[in-house]
Amino acid sequence: MASPRTVTIVALSVTLGLFFVFMGTIKLTPRLSKDAYSEMKRAYKSYVKALPALKKIGISSVFLRKAIGSLELACGIVLTLVPGRPKDVANFILLLLVLIVLFFHQLVGDPLKRYAHALVFGILLTCRLLVSRQPEEEFPEKKLSRGNNGAHSREPIKMKVS
């Protein structure tokens, strides 16, 4: 049976991965939702207007939207399908992207309802990263029941109380 930690990591990975695949796709193409795509275009234009330094270094709203959308799509696929350490790397990249997007929302003065989803998914990404970095814990009854060569031992538990 899978440990609660494993179930939590898998559930968060799949859910977050699919969400970011969806959001990245919306930023890249109008095929899923024309309204959401046009809203993303408008939002990224306002982000570049609010931060003139981006324009000075040659980053247009189209490039910014496509870069963030591509990263979200790629990291979402990794988070959903790829096992092991790459999931943690994708999780970290997505967490940085969420922080950047939250910065942009604050910069243009968006109300909380416009970026509440980014806050929630940032918290979920943080939780997934923290849970995945925890070492696997062995339950005390399993430790006690194993003696030499896997035989069951009946030694009492000794606890030091200070």
From Swiss-Prot:
For region Disordered, the annotated ranges are 141-162
Q: State the annotated membrane topology for this chain.
A: Multi-pass membrane protein
Q: Where is the signal peptide?
A: none
Supply the alphabetized keyword list: Chaperone, Cytoplasmic vesicle, Endoplasmic reticulum, Membrane, Peroxisome, Transmembrane, Transmembrane helix
What stretch or stretches form a coiled coil here?
none
Q: Which GO terms describe its biological process?
A: chaperone-mediated protein complex assembly; positive regulation of protein localization to cell surface
Q: What InterPro entries does the annotation carry?
A: TMEM35A/B
Biased composition, class Basic and acidic residues, residue ranges: 152-162
Q: Where in the cell is it found?
A: Peroxisome membrane; Cytoplasmic vesicle; Endoplasmic reticulum membrane
Bilayer-spanning residue ranges = 6-26, 62-82, 89-109, 115-131
Lumenal face of the membrane: 27-61, 110-114
- A cellular component annotation (GO) from this entry: endoplasmic reticulum membrane
Principal localization reads membrane
Side of membrane Cytoplasmic, spans = 1-5, 83-88, 132-162
Similarity comment text for this entry: Belongs to the DoxX family.
Describe the task this protein carries out: Molecular chaperone which mediates the proper assembly and functional expression of the nicotinic acetylcholine receptors (nAChRs) throughout the brain. Essential for the proper folding, assembly, function and surface trafficking of alpha-7 (CHRNA7), alpha-4-beta-2, alpha-3-beta-2 and alpha-3-beta-4 receptors.
Matching entries from PANTHER family are given as:
NOVEL ACETYLCHOLINE RECEPTOR CHAPERONE, SPINAL CORD EXPRESSION PROTEIN 4
What is this protein's record name?
Novel acetylcholine receptor chaperone
Source species: Xenopus tropicalis
